[in-house]
Amino acid sequence: MERRDLYDKNRNFTGKTIYKGESVPEGSYIVVVLIYIQNSKGEFLLQKRSARKNGLWATTGGHPKSGEDSIQGILTEVKEEIGVDLNPEKLIKYYAGRSEKERVFWDDYYIKMDIDNIEELKLQKEEVEKVGWFSINEIKNLNKKGKFFKNHYEEFEALMDWLEKSNQCNII
């Protein structure tokens, strides 16, 4: 069974782990990673989560396994969930934060890359129903209709702010 590392409030590894699905003990935190993949047309790759995972649209993310850092964790999640290999040197961490309520550290990544033939990607059926490219306005509309995973939309807004401030790319 998959294990996750526990950290203190300063993100120091405590030497303790929990099993996937276990509650995070008070005073401890786990790491959550996610990534927004943007193509050269300015669209973002989203995945429709499986019915058992709420069936909403979201980006790819999850929890690093015990022993993985956040970069290794996001590389693993993307490979497992949608079958894509990412170049770690191209990853940009655009946000890092801590949620007391959820007892997590967030590490959000961004990468600009084109992925051809997304209909041929090897999806993890337990987690992902399908994938698609979406414009910024389409993502905003999904959110307005309640079809976008709330936590991931908050991270999308943080990405939009970061892209605008950093002039990393043409976001329109």
Model regions and ranges:
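Acidic, metal-coordinating catalytic segment for phosphate/diphosphate chemistry
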Residues: 1-34, 40
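The catalytic Nudix box helix
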Residues: 46, 58-92
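Nudix hydrolase/Nudix homology domain
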Residues: 54-57, 100-104, 108, 118-172
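Active-site segment of metal-dependent pyrophosphate-handling enzymes
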Residues: 79-119
